[in-house]
Swiss-Prot record:
GO terms for molecular function: NADH dehydrogenase activity; oxidoreductase activity, acting on NAD(P)H, quinone or similar compound as acceptor; quinone binding. Keywords: Cell inner membrane, Cell membrane, Membrane, NAD, Quinone, Translocase, Transmembrane, Transmembrane helix, Ubiquinone. It comes from Helicobacter pylori (strain J99 / ATCC 700824) (Campylobacter pylori J99). It is a multi-pass membrane protein. NDH-1 is composed of 14 different subunits. Subunits NuoA, H, J, K, L, M, N constitute the membrane sector of the complex. HAMAP family: NDH1_NuoH. This is NADH-quinone oxidoreductase subunit H. The chain crosses the membrane at residues 9-29, 42-62, 75-95, 117-137, 154-174, 188-208, 238-258, 269-291, 309-329. NCBIfam families: PRK06076.1-2. One of its GO terms (cellular component) is plasma membrane. GO terms for biological process: aerobic respiration. Belongs to the complex I subunit 1 family. The lineage of its organism: Bacteria, Pseudomonadati, Campylobacterota, Epsilonproteobacteria, Campylobacterales. The gene is nuoH.
Amino acid sequence: MSAYIIETLIKILILVAVFSALGGFATYIERKVLAYFQRRLGPCYVGPFGLLQVAADGIKLFTKEDIIPQGANKFIFTLAPIIAMVSAFVSMAPIPFFPNFTLFGYEIKPLISDINIGFLFFLAVGSAGIYAPILAGLASNNKYSLIGSARATIQLLSFEVVSTLTILAPLMVVGSLSLVEINHYQSGGFLDWLVFKQPLAFVLFLIASYAELNRTPFDLLEHEAEIVAGYCTEYSGLKWGMFFLAEYAHLFAFSFVISIVFFGGFNAWGFIPGGIAILIKAGFFVFLSMWVRATYPHVRPDQLMNMCWKIMLPLALLNIVLTGIVILI
């Protein structure tokens, strides 16, 4: 029992350290990608190819003054970014990032908890992060923060419904909520990937994921031209950095989950080993989010809600019905 606890604690430390570092590095990659699309250079002065820009940004965040606005609720103002970080990293617990491997004669499972309701746990804990923008907006004593938190409540709750209903169809096909079982279901090869059996579910879940992640063109929670930085307007320094890292941690988590559910996960991909294959797939979806950000303009709140409730929700329900009919036949 003690060995299991020690192993779990080590896995948690590795997960937090690795994805925190990746979150910082992803800022550099995203700025370079956006610069390429916009015919700019991007970061290029700090270190070779601008690689040390990440370190410079980190030093800036850690040394900035932590300002709490006058009239703000200090406890809730501080609690909000902690909730964002905790929900982002805890939601990764049931995600199998790689195949099992042996180290010094000991089999290592590269996930924190192999529970049979892994996907439900991922959605539930990830959606708990909605309290972060709500509390941040309410505690900041700022009108723009309050508008941002109101938008967060509407947008995240709406798309949480869509993403949950959308994923029911693939889960009906597999017959399990375990992400490990979903991965094993697609072990037969390329044609067993669920994206070919549930293409509509994949498209709907991808769009809903970007909306839940607050990625452009769905970043209504912090749209600079309308509400400054939304619920983050009054945050600075380390607290703002925690919101920032939480957003990227959610992006990585959703990228891995989409790769596992629809694209064969860590099963070997031809001559490519499974561990490398899932990194390629997840990396592609991280890049795709940056590509979408550089390509599409913002949508209006009313357009987003119309798309959610009048288009995506009926399509998700229709897909569930059709999948059930096919399974019965």
